């Protein structure tokens, strides 16, 4: 099993404190890995800074070829990567193989193509005797912090646009789920020039702070919690570093009386519980119009109760464990707080399953009120709440009364209503009669406390560039 760090083109052992990496399906230790030492963090950033001189000047064709080669290598090693991701995260293996690995490969391939299509604006004479040009140039060294819910996919989302734009990257995966990022380091080692990609391991307070605060780091990209985002913004503020933040969500799912309720129930069964609900776009905050509320609660209860929990390697498993013992405790506390409210009805789940591993039963909580914490705070687990609403204006107000602004969906057969709400919902993405669908060509990112900046799409590529004006006198 690959457990070494990638620094300046070489795989090396960490020199810091050893940390245990767990299998969440069993609670057992997979292995121990040594963190990067402060000296190794410094070496990785300096390697990236040195490599940037040449990499930032390479042609888009060369960068694209490297990204395509890495995509091919991921495809060739797909089963090994999927098994590592499943073992370290508790994801059902078939979901990683069939859903996540193809999407990861596509992200690298998309940005390989996009790298060759990034242009500045046309030249022009805006002052007599002078010609102006607009360039889009790479930022420099990017420190990327990836989360524990989709370790390999988020590594791809961080690496691909940054590298395509000509930046060099030092990436730190979560210390909870580092195995696929470390394997990716081994695959990338002989494809990219030394220092272009560096992969470290360690906790935020020991490695993350040293990395994001390093004077040579020009940009920090984070996918994580609001609290982590706030910390990094405070930590990097004195140096005025560029930042790119994706900080979670609490997606409203608005279901009107005319919606196809069978499609809604089956959709939420998937969109609310994929990856054990550990997804910032999960369909977790349901608003159902009063005329269909009771029917939808019944249909959702049946759908949620039918989800099969089990071992990640079992092909029939739909729901795996949560990522860690600490996160299991957080999800349990959030549900217990909701259950203590007299108006909340537990339709399904609402408890840990017991036994080995960090499993929490798929949960549906009915009759939640707008002010309840279960409606307002991200749980990040297999937990969905449902609230009744009366009319369009009320539900629009409730949906937007949230500190989050990442994803939302509207379920209706009324095209005019779909357009009206889509235009007024304060979310980075709004789906109509579906949820959770992502493609490499379209941007993903939030507003409000869900952060700023885009992943994927040409907008994501532009976020890793600087706009520069060149003026020539003639």
From Swiss-Prot:
Pfam family, one: Aldedh
Domain of life: Bacteria
GO biological process: L-lysine catabolic process; putrescine catabolic process
Enzyme class: oxidoreductase
GO MF terms, alphabetically ordered: aminobutyraldehyde dehydrogenase (NAD+) activity; NAD binding
Keyword Oxidoreductase carried by entry: yes
Residues engaged in binding NAD(+): 146-148, 172-175, 209, 225-228, 280
Keywords: NAD, Oxidoreductase
Catalytic residues, chain numbering: 246, 280 (nucleophile)
Catalytic activity of the protein: 4-aminobutanal + NAD(+) + H2O = 4-aminobutanoate + NADH + 2 H(+); 5-aminopentanal + NAD(+) + H2O = 5-aminopentanoate + NADH + 2 H(+)
Record pathway: Amine and polyamine degradation; putrescine degradation; 4-aminobutanoate from 4-aminobutanal: step 1/1; Amino-acid degradation
EC number: 1.2.1.19, 1.2.1.-
Function: Catalyzes the oxidation 4-aminobutanal (gamma-aminobutyraldehyde) to 4-aminobutanoate (gamma-aminobutyrate or GABA). This is the second step in one of two pathways for putrescine degradation, where putrescine is converted into 4-aminobutanoate via 4-aminobutanal. Also functions as a 5-aminopentanal dehydrogenase in a a L-lysine degradation pathway to succinate that proceeds via cadaverine, glutarate and L-2-hydroxyglutarate.
Family statement: Belongs to the aldehyde dehydrogenase family. Gamma-aminobutyraldehyde dehydrogenase subfamily.
Subunit field text: Homotetramer.
Misc: 4-aminobutanal can spontaneously cyclize to 1-pyrroline, and 5-aminopentanal to 1-piperideine.
Protein name per its UniProtKB record: Gamma-aminobutyraldehyde dehydrogenase
Taxonomic lineage from the root: Bacteria, Pseudomonadati, Pseudomonadota, Gammaproteobacteria, Enterobacterales
